[in-house]
Amino acid sequence: MHTGEEMSKDFNIEIEYKHVPRLDAGSDESISYLDEHGYVVIKNALSTEEAKKTLDLLWDYLEALGTGIDRNNPNTWDDDKWPTCAHGGIMPSYGIGHSEAQWFLRGIPNVKKAFAKIWDTDELLTSFDGVSLWRPWNLNSEWKTESGQAWFHIDQHPISKPGKQCIQGLVNLLPTSEE
């Protein structure tokens, strides 16, 4: 596992780990933070029920691919059944951008509220990129994404290209840790 210092050397960046405030969707404070830092973390963007439903819809999508994936059987999550993903988890293909899970997620009130405040309109347009689906590496060490890989990215860097030209959202549906 790379340390922040090693990643700095690999990518010529400085990584600072710090507490980041969680702000209300659609609040003036969230927009001020976004303007100042280039990102914002929205607290309670999804309820527990909305996160669970989104996750269930993603599993429905994966099982409907017809490759033999079964959400209840991790033995079916191997590469021969799992959709091809970039960097171990980024899935931009297979119609995932138009999946029921993605449309459900885009329609969640706090998600819409956050973007409506950013763009100062309720008339929102969306792109149809992909999703990132990482399998639990504690079940198979080959599924682990090593720190320092370029899997996690943003399309608009807040320092080299400031302003609001390409605002992306990221939603964790399961608990995460620094590991």
Which sequence ranges carry the predicted segments?
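Non-heme Fe(II)-dependent double-stranded beta-helix
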Residues: 2-36, 43-159
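Intrinsically disordered, low-complexity acidic/polar segments
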Residues: 51, 178-179
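Short, conserved beta-strand element in jelly-roll/cupin
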Residues: 157-178
